């Protein structure tokens, strides 16, 4: 008697997107919000122009990273800020921007407001997103905390409605 093994399929979080000078829109706005949250003075306009490029290079230098002006996995990982209910500011705006971009708020008529306040609506949207991820990737916690795994899933575009 022979036993055949079924092929193992393991879902994983999509890789971080590479973002560089000249890119526009998503996820440049999120990048700009995170740079602002790290103290860089720039306008969130969705354009990765000279000002954003300079802020990225400065951030990379401050963090001891390779200074190439390209936002890849190492820079994203250093840039993200864990946020949860009660958090406020530009990092929260970055999360909310991701939800708006992909219509992940769960409400087809009203997107999540980008107001920088991690309140009940943002918490519900985050938990719903995490629950959807958890179905395919059981290691994803459904805790309402936007940490490294949830940030990566958001920025890389794991789900859209």
Walk through the language-model features, giving the residues of each.
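Cell-envelope/ECM-targeting effectors and their regulatory/trafficking segments
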Residues: 1-161
